[in-house]
């Protein structure tokens, strides 16, 4: 029996308040309006950005259904939708690509003005919500809200992918892999023979390591205080791994000594102000490029000496690895299907969706790289 045009009742993980566990609830998911798509989720990854909301470091309206790194199958579409149809395998896009705004028209940028990241409203693009629980409307997250058996997204925030794609793997291309990998190949534009440093060896950091390797870097120095992550980093391309706690001097000084004055490219993939500064300082003062990839804590500012940049450093930021999402994500999936890279090493745990809180416990303990929840 078709569910198109009808309210769907299903399970979702609702965050009612910060610093509390998720609650598995019965929710109602309204049908898609014009230019919207309703998706049956198949697999979703647990990303640090979701945890930033739980911890209170990233502020978004509550109660909310989080989740933004996922893959699923189109259940139904609203009026006017032309780029996907029911039955298509898709990845929701936490940064849309409307194709019409100034950013989308600029070939060098991807932070579409239809995004809900900079100043979150917790709605779809028309300003309304599609989730109800216990009679209350529930907010969306980044226009995706994938911690639900069904979700509704705008058409410009979903990408059709290869019908043969294994969704329990390519869900990582929805955020973690593309964000890290693209930060190296698209944003920093790592060059062959160069020296790189990657701060933070979670799923995104390891994907940045993979990007540096793919771009031909000669040295890739992985930096983390958790030595348990070093073997995986080396497996994926790191040439050296260092723990800041093993040194008496600041880690940027250690890196500068190791690299004749500083690395060519550095990546902060943690989201801490102190490591953002260390990452900037460890790149060469005359020709280094440092990229901020980790989401910073809310309402905290950095103050820096302008001389750090005047000498020739470049300091950049990146969302979604610089990929124009609706165009770039299907191409990455095609590359995965062509075996140009593997995602297996990033997925350390697979759990049923109902065990979402266990998945976040694994994240907090540092025992997981990526936990994938299956529906």
Curated annotation (Swiss-Prot):
It is found in: Cytoplasm. It catalyses: all-trans-retinol + NAD(+) = all-trans-retinal + NADH + H(+); all-trans-4-hydroxyretinol + NAD(+) = all-trans-4-hydroxyretinal + NADH + H(+); all-trans-4-oxoretinol + NAD(+) = all-trans-4-oxoretinal + NADH + H(+). Its EC number is 1.1.1.105. PROSITE patterns: ADH_ZINC. There are 7 different ADH's isozymes in human: three belongs to class-I: alpha, beta, and gamma, one to class-II: pi, one to class-III: chi, one to class-IV: ADH7 and one to class-V: ADH6. InterPro entries: ADH-like_C (IPR013149), ADH-like_N (IPR013154), ADH_Zn_CS (IPR002328), GroES-like_sf (IPR011032), NAD(P)-bd_dom_sf (IPR036291), PKS_ER (IPR020843). Its main location: cytoplasm. GO terms for biological process: retinoic acid metabolic process; retinoid metabolic process; retinol metabolic process. NAD(+) binds at residues 200-205, 224, 229, 293-295, 370. The modification Phosphotyrosine is found at residue 35. This is All-trans-retinol dehydrogenase [NAD(+)] ADH1B. The keyword Signal does not apply. Signal peptide: none annotated. Belongs to the zinc-containing alcohol dehydrogenase family. It holds the Pfam family ADH_zinc_N. GO terms for molecular function: alcohol dehydrogenase (NAD+) activity; all-trans-retinol dehydrogenase (NAD+) activity; zinc ion binding. Its cofactor is Zn(2+). The modification N-acetylserine is found at residue 2. SMART domains: PKS_ER (SM00829). The modification Phosphoserine is found at residue 23. Keywords: Acetylation, Cytoplasm, Lipid metabolism, Metal-binding, NAD, Oxidoreductase, Phosphoprotein, Zinc. Catalyzes the NAD-dependent oxidation of all-trans-retinol and its derivatives such as all-trans-4-hydroxyretinol and may participate in retinoid metabolism. In vitro can also catalyze the NADH-dependent reduction of all-trans-retinal and its derivatives such as all-trans-4-oxoretinal. Catalyzes in the oxidative direction with higher efficiency. Has the same affinity for all-trans-4-hydroxyretinol and all-trans-4-oxoretinal. Zn(2+) 1 binds at residues 47, 68, 175. Gene3D superfamilies: Medium-chain alcohol dehydrogenases, catalytic domain, NAD(P)-binding Rossmann-like Domain. One of its GO terms (cellular component) is nucleoplasm.
